[in-house]
Curated annotation (Swiss-Prot):
Gene assigned in the entry: glgC
Assembly description: Homotetramer.
Domain of life the protein comes from: Bacteria
Chain segments annotated as coiled-coil in the UniProt record: none
Pathway: Glycan biosynthesis; glycogen biosynthesis
PROSITE patterns assigned: ADP_GLC_PYROPHOSPH_1 (PS00808), ADP_GLC_PYROPHOSPH_2 (PS00809), ADP_GLC_PYROPHOSPH_3 (PS00810)
Organism listed in the record: Hydrogenovibrio crunogenus (strain DSM 25203 / XCL-2)
Protein name: Glucose-1-phosphate adenylyltransferase
Length: 422
């Protein structure tokens, strides 16, 4: 495995690029999963946090000047970044720098995505980048940003926006764009009620990935203009991008493979989308390859022993099928099917866990049945508990997402107070 991947075709560009990761969002659609943590800090894939994917993309793309802007309930996110990303060496121009909301400009906190950057203008200027790469910290994907940087520089664009095809009726939660034959953006609407369809693809819309490459001075100019506009909501998608479409070079960069097909990218903003993206990893050949040694996903994990599967009696056999089981787990006479069991989990005898996601340090006592569920970090599931079979009963105890029927269980719902405030 490489320490990092340095792209050969764009190293000058990547060295002159500052990446800023917007990681301050509340993630309210994830309900109680973000009650005590920011969305980018939510565990994912057995041993990672959501933010690890965008940070790994930066490092693997050769971009090693990175700022992480935090605000909402940021303690676990800050702690994770400090532990996982301290291998960057500032002496040779590498860093992952935490930029919490700290009222640098006035008495207000970050009011929106554009305001978060505006309040850190002095820090951006200090690093003297030629380009600023703005990223969301809450999506799951692998992407070589150097290709997008190269296209931006070659085209002479003022800003380039990463985009991907999505089902048209799912595009209401994204910025939706229209482009000409040269991928110049001709229209941009943030979260439209009736998204525009793509030409010749009536069931698809071209959605923003929340990835922007700005030429630095252009970005500074537009941030200042936006800050001076009393009618602005201080947001890139709602304010800055629509205002520059007509008079400036705003281009789209489709996120696709060598054959022109869309590549794996997931917005895990709801319980169902988080659950689906997690179980995607359990397929035989996942679209997101966690095992690619040329594109490793970096993270922090406490030193843990290997996963252990014990007992081989009929009806009490420790086994996992089509599942991910992370380090430190013990599957003790239990059956796991198409599920993710995260670090330090312990599933006791005579249990069945299927189509579920267990976050780190979950303990499932004997004779439990769990299906179609997300179990939050640190939960202890009492003996004999049944989750996911009777949604009416589950609604009385837990959160059930109405559209999907996925059940979310947290320690607070079980009466287990892990966060004592008084």
């Amino acid at each position: 495995m490489k320490y990092y991947c340095e792209t050969k075709s764009a190293t000058d560009l990547t060295r002159k690029t500052l990446a800023l990761v917007l990681a301050g969002g509340e993630g309210s659609r994830l309900k109680d999963l973000t009650k005590w943590r920011a969305k980018p800090a939510v565990p994912f894939g057995g041993k990672y946090r959501i933010i690890d994917f965008v940070l790994s993309n930066c490092v693997n793309s050769g971009i090693r000047k990175i700022g992480v802007l935090t605000q909402y309930k940021s303690h676990s996110l800050i702690r994770h970044v400090q532990r996982a990303w301290s291998f960057m060496r500032y002496e040779v121009g590498e860093f992952v720098e935490l930029l919490p909301a700290q009222q640098r400009v006035d008495k207000g906190w970050y009011k929106g995505t554009a305001d978060a950057l505006y309040q850190n203008l002095d820090i951006m200027r200090r690093h003297t980048p030629d380009y600023v790469l703005v990223l969301g910290g809450d999506h799951i994907y692998s992407m070589d940003y150097s290709k997008m940087l190269y296209e931006h520089a070659e085209s002479g664009a003022d800003v380039t926006i990463g985009c991907i095809e999505v089902p048209r009726m799912e595009a209401t939660g994204f910025g939706v764009m229209s482009v000409d034959e040269c991928f110049k953006i001709t229209k941009f609407t943030e979260k439209p009620a009736n998204p525009d369809a793509m030409p010749h693809k009536p069931d698809k819309a071209l959605a923003s990935m929340g990835i922007y490459v700005f030429s630095t001075e252009f970005l500074f100019q537009k941030l200042i203009e936006d800050a001076d506009n009393p009618n602005s909501s201080r947001d890139f998608g709602k304010d800055i991008i629509p205002s520059i479409i007509e008079d400036w070079q705003v281009r789209a960069f489709p996120f696709e493979d060598e054959t022109g097909l869309p590549v794996y990218w997931r917005d895990v903003g709801t319980i169902e989308s988080y659950w689906k993206a997690s179980l995607d990893l359990c397929s035989i050949t996942p679209d997101l390859n966690l095992y690619d040694e040329d594109w490793p996903i970096w993270t922090y994990q406490a030193q843990m022993p290997p996963a252990k599967f014990i007992f081989d009696d009929e009806g009490r056999r420790g086994e996992a099928i089509d599942s991910l089981v992370a380090g430190g787990c013990i599957i003790s006479g239990a059956r796991i099917k198409r599920s993710v069991i995260s670090s330090g989990g312990h599933v006791h005898s005579f249990c069945l866990v299927k189509d579920s996601v267990l976050l780190p340090r979950v303990k499932v006592e004997r004779n439990c049945r769990i299906q179609n569920a997300v179990i939050d970090k640190g939960c202890v599931i009492p003996e004999g508990t049944v989750i996911g079979e009777d949604l009416e009963a589950d609604r009385k105890r837990f959160y059930v997402e109405e559209a999907s029927g996925i059940v979310l269980v947290t320690p607070d719902m079980l009466g287990q107070r892990l966060h004592i405030t008084r």
